[in-house]
Amino acid sequence: IGMEGTYANDIQAALKLVNQYRWEACSNGYPNPVNGKKLTKNDYVPMEWSAGLEYLARIRAAESSQTIAHERTNGSNCFQIQTPGGYSSGGECLAWWSWDLDMTTGVELWYNEKDAYLNQTGGVTGHYTSMISPSNRYVGMGAFGTSTAQYYSTSCAEFSGTNNSETFQF
């Protein structure tokens, strides 16, 4: 979509934080989001960066800065977006905030769901569980800042259990 804005590029810091939270979940035996069994240190696999998922996440961060929802600006489902090679994601996390633009803030906001997940409070937990789930092996993120939105900063993470071999120049 055409709009004025800026993308954050702190990829390594965001990926490191996601992997830190994954390690914490595995080393502390938190419930596996897939089957409810306790995670173990052997379940820990570092999340890898996917350029294809980053491609999707950058578009979705800009789109969702306007929609404030898991839907595209044309009203279609967020999972209908595909890379030029036809790949899509298996899960999407979004976050909005009104302070400085960076990728790690979104990761920290999703991490804040941990207590609701561990204590089964009924609160939102899907963003946190997407980060720690062993079935998600690849991630791409985009963080977009624009003064034309309700919140200045929007972060999007796209997750998948499989990678694609596409490369992109951002």
What residue ranges belong to the model's regions?
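A well-ordered secondary-structure block
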Residues: 77-169
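Short, well-ordered surface patches within globular domains
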Residues: 1-85, 128, 134-139
